[in-house]
Every structure is written in C-alpha cells, then in structure tokens.
Amino acid sequence: MGGGERYNIPAPQSRNVSKNQQQLNRQKTKEQNSQMKIVHKKKERGHGYNSSAAAWQAMQNGGKNKNFPNNQSWNSSLSGPRLLFKSQANQNYAGAKFSEPPSPSVLPKPPSHWVPVSFNPSDKEIMTFQLKTLLKVQV
C-alpha cells in the first residue's frame, strides 16, 4: 500500500557545467523517474493488460462478443418471464389489497368534535359536495 519506489538514475556531472545544463539534467531524471512510476502503476492495476486494445477490438466487432456462443437452452429458459414468477403467484399474499376498499368497521372513528352528532339530509348533501370538490371528484 505504500508509495512506489523512487528510482534515482545518476547522471554524469562535471564540475564546470552551467546552471542551465544542471536544470536540464534534473528535468531528465525527473521525467525518467515519473515514467518508471507510471509503468509500475500500470502493471499493478491491469497486470500489464492493455485495455485500450480490448476496447478497440470490441468496437471493431460491432459490440458483439464472440467469446460467448449463442446457447439455445439459455435463451429458451428466459423466453417466458411468467414461468419465473409462477410459483410466487400461487402463494397467498398476506399484505393489504389496495384494489378493494376496507370495510367501514375496520376504519377508525373520527373524534366526536370533528363531526356534528345529528345530520339533516341537506347537510349530508352539502358535505358530500364539499368533499367531492376538495378531492376533485366529478359530481
């Protein structure tokens, strides 16, 4: 997990070399060191495998993978998706069925102060109209 090793390649230097020449030599050694690190990292990640060549080959094949033959038994087993869920459809589902409304006896009763105790038929009609308007149900 540690960092890559640093390769220092000694460059022959003479004592009378100008500063520009020394800077060039330093740049060359840095470039060589960075190239060695890049090669080392590529080998670690891809184990020396060239991924761009594989991508180019896949593109040339038109996206078709030639490594896997067309297996008819595999395709026929997936041809009917209903067969995959057939065993599950026969089992009873214990959850709520949302297609059927719950019976009024199961529903909780509203607090007494929400609803007046006595209703006139006209009050019920007005309340029904108001509820349908609020819920945007066609009257």
UniProtKB/Swiss-Prot annotation:
Residues 11-36, 61-79 have a biased composition (Polar residues). Involved in nonsense-mediated mRNA decay (NMD) by acting as a bridge between the mRNA decapping complex and the NMD machinery. May act by targeting the NMD machinery to the P-body and recruiting the decapping machinery to aberrant mRNAs. Required for UPF1/RENT1 localization to the P-body. Plays a role in glucocorticoid receptor-mediated mRNA degradation by interacting with the glucocorticoid receptor NR3C1 in a ligand-dependent manner when it is bound to the 5' UTR of target mRNAs and recruiting the RNA helicase UPF1 and the mRNA-decapping enzyme DCP1A, leading to RNA decay. Interacts with UPF1/RENT1; preferentially interacts with hyperphosphorylated form. Interacts with DCP1A. Interacts with many nuclear receptors including ESR1, ESRRA, ESRRG, NR3C1/GR, NR5A1, PGR, TR, RAR and RXR. Keywords: Activator, Cytoplasm, Nonsense-mediated mRNA decay, Nucleus, Transcription, Transcription regulation. This is Proline-rich nuclear receptor coactivator 2. The keyword Nucleus applies. It is found in: Nucleus; Cytoplasm, P-body. GO terms for biological process: deadenylation-independent decapping of nuclear-transcribed mRNA; nuclear-transcribed mRNA catabolic process, nonsense-mediated decay. One of its GO terms (cellular component) is nucleus. Residues 101-110 have a biased composition (Pro residues). Belongs to the PNRC family. PNRC2 subfamily. It comes from Homo sapiens (Human). Changing residue 114 to A: Abolishes the interaction with DCP1A. Pfam families: PNRC.
